[in-house]
């Protein structure tokens, strides 16, 4: 059996808590809006690529989002999305 047949378990480090992720995303969202960007597409671009250029320095947004692991942000987004769909 090849390793492609086995399911790998992914664990996210417990560095940031839910409030940190929510607060950071809210601040980044506001900064993107203020600069005239589409916040959703810019955040998605950042999460998919890891390129901080998707997030402006305005209101320290780039620094704020850079303090969080992208996998932790994605985990929080999926958790909230699925909990609202139950």
Curated annotation (Swiss-Prot):
Q: Which Pfam families match?
A: IreB
Which InterPro entries does this UniProt record tie to the protein?
IreB (IPR009309)
The UniProt family comment states: Belongs to the UPF0297 family.
PANTHER family in UniProt: UPF0297 PROTEIN YRZL
**Name of the protein in its database record:** UPF0297 protein BBR47_19030
Q: What is the phylogenetic placement of the source species in the record?
A: Bacteria, Bacillati, Bacillota, Bacilli, Bacillales
């Amino acid at each position: 059996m090849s390793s492609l047949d086995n399911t790998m378990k992914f664990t996210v480090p417990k560095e940031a808590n839910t409030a940190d992720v929510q607060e950071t995303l809210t601040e980044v969202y506001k900064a993107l809006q203020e600069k005239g960007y589409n916040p959703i597409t810019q955040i998605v671009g950042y999460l998919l690529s890891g390129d901080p250029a998707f997030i402006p320095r305005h209101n320290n947004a780039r620094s704020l989002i850079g303090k969080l692991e992208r996998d932790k942000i994605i985990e929080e987004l999926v958790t909230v999305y699925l909990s609202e769909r139950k």
